[in-house]
Swiss-Prot record:
SUPFAM superfamilies: RmlC-like cupins. Coiled coil: none annotated. This is Protein Ves. Belongs to the Ves family.
């Protein structure tokens, strides 16, 4: 289990100066050719998403104005707060910020031939489904994960096991992404 606080994470500026990335975790850890990766990005200007051939991307708007996503004849989609949207990461996708507002997004990418991610918003206590990896990010409220208290802009990532996240207040929201491995693949094969 790895815990993080977004406010204390290192920031990588994009080469085109249109945004920045805070990498939460990758699997396998510290590998350039990852099977899955979770990050938080801040987008300050209109532009194109980076291409990642063979990957699926799920983007969830956390803060800021809505973002319009366009991929030639494939799709036109307005990204709204806390509504995950998935697309092939090898498509050219243009992002246009509405009203010029900066946006902050949660991104998870998975290798299409190895694993699949699901992203949900939780508003009550729950137990993960025993996946072989996952990430949680607290949007608001106070949540208990094992012996650790997580509050706004904090989270955790893990590579195996079931975990219970307990909401400690009457209301709260967290983003939860679970990684499931496709038949014939296992995280044990790559470590």
């Amino acid at each position: 289990m790895e815990y993080f606080d977004m406010r204390k994470m290192s920031v990588n500026l994009w080469r085109n100066a249109a945004g920045e990335t805070r990498e939460i975790c990758t699997f396998p850890p510290a590998k350039r050719d990852f099977y899955w990766r979770a990050s938080i990005t801040s987008i300050a200007a209109n532009g194109e998403f980076s291409l990642f051939p063979g990957m699926e991307r799920i983007v969830t708007l956390l803060e800021g104005g809505e973002m319009f996503l366009e991929s030639a004849d494939r799709f036109n989609h307005t990204l709204k707060p806390l509504q995950p949207f998935s697309f092939a990461a090898d498509l050219v996708v243009k992002a246009k910020l509405t009203a010029g507002q900066m946006s902050m997004d949660f991104n998870i990418m998975t290798r299409l031939d190895v694993c699949k991610a699901k992203v949900r918003i939780a508003e009550r206590t729950f137990t993960t489904f025993g996946s072989r990896g996952g990430v949680v990010f607290v949007i608001n409220g106070a949540w208990q994960l094992g012996d650790k208290l997580l509050t706004t802009d904090q989270g955790a990532c893990w590579f195996d096991g079931r975990h219970t996240l307990r909401l400690l207040q009457p209301q709260g929201k967290l983003l939860f992404s679970e990684i499931n491995w496709l038949a014939g693949h296992s995280p044990d094969q790559v470590q």
